[in-house]
């Protein structure tokens, strides 16, 4: 009869322990009810990209000297640089520059090693199309500046309203390179 009593006592202790664990999990769950949701509704809300985000590449035709360093440092030899040698000025003349973003891995080596800084990474990441051939950007498409997420009034950014009001007041007085 003694083992039966100890069995009931251990059963009671296990029940109390299980009740305590369930209570702790309920408290943890209820403590998260005041939090904002982490998931964003992508087409209508966009997260703000970090300062050094590696998005679409921006190209400045006038700065390029056709040295082809970007092609040499690219792991997949992606940029296509067409040039001709001008004998009268003894320099390369850039004719065409293109990048296929369907193949690009956005490593940023071309931007990092460009001696004239004619390449830069933008915050634009929406490059989806129905035809993969539309992702082959020439120098005209590459020189197009991206629409800033902060300036687009149709999109809500993921920030607290008081924080975004302070930032709007600061940004109305001065514009940075990322505010196009």
Swiss-Prot record:
One cellular-component annotation, GO: chloroplast thylakoid membrane
Record's bilayer topology term: Peripheral membrane protein
Needed co-factor(s): [4Fe-4S] cluster
Stored InterPro entries: 4Fe4S_Fe-S-bd (IPR017896), 4Fe4S_Fe_S_CS (IPR017900), NADH_quinone_OxRdtase_chainI (IPR010226), NDHI (IPR004497)
Binding residues annotated for [4Fe-4S] cluster 1, in chain numbering: 64, 67, 70, 114
Segments forming domain 4Fe-4S ferredoxin-type: 55-84, 95-124
Gene3D superfamilies per the UniProt record, alphabetical: 3.30.70.3270
Record key words, sorted: 4Fe-4S, Chloroplast, Iron, Iron-sulfur, Membrane, Metal-binding, NAD, NADP, Plastid, Plastoquinone, Quinone, Repeat, Thylakoid, Translocase
Catalytic activity: a plastoquinone + NADH + (n+1) H(+)(in) = a plastoquinol + NAD(+) + n H(+)(out); a plastoquinone + NADPH + (n+1) H(+)(in) = a plastoquinol + NADP(+) + n H(+)(out)
Subcellular locations according to the entry: Plastid, Chloroplast thylakoid membrane
The keyword NADP is assigned to this record: yes
Residues engaged in binding [4Fe-4S] cluster 2: 74, 104, 107, 110
Subunit and partners: NDH is composed of at least 16 different subunits, 5 of which are encoded in the nucleus.
Protein name: NAD(P)H-quinone oxidoreductase subunit I, chloroplastic
Organism: Triticum aestivum (Wheat)
């Amino acid at each position: 009869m003694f083992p039966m009593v100890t069995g009931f006592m251990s059963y009671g202790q296990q029940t109390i322990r299980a009740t305590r664990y369930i209570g702790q999990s309920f408290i943890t769950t209820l403590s998260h009810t005041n939090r904002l949701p982490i998931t964003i509704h992508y087409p209508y809300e966009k997260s703000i990209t970090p300062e050094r985000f590696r998005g679409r590449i921006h190209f400045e035709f006038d700065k390029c000297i056709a040295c082809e360093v970007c092609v040499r440092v690219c792991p997949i030899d992606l940029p296509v640089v067409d040039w001709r040698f001008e004998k009268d000025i003894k320099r390369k003349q850039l004719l065409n520059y293109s990048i296929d973003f369907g193949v690009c891995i956005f490593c940023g080596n071309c931007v990092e090693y460009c001696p004239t800084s004619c390449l830069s990474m933008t915050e634009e990441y929406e490059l989806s199309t129905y035809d993969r051939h539309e992702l082959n950007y020439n120098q005209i498409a590459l020189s197009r500046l991206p629409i800033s997420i902060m300036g687009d009034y149709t999109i809500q950014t993921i920030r607290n309203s008081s924080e975004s009001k302070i930032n709007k007041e600061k940004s109305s007085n001065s514009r940075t390179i990322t505010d196009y």
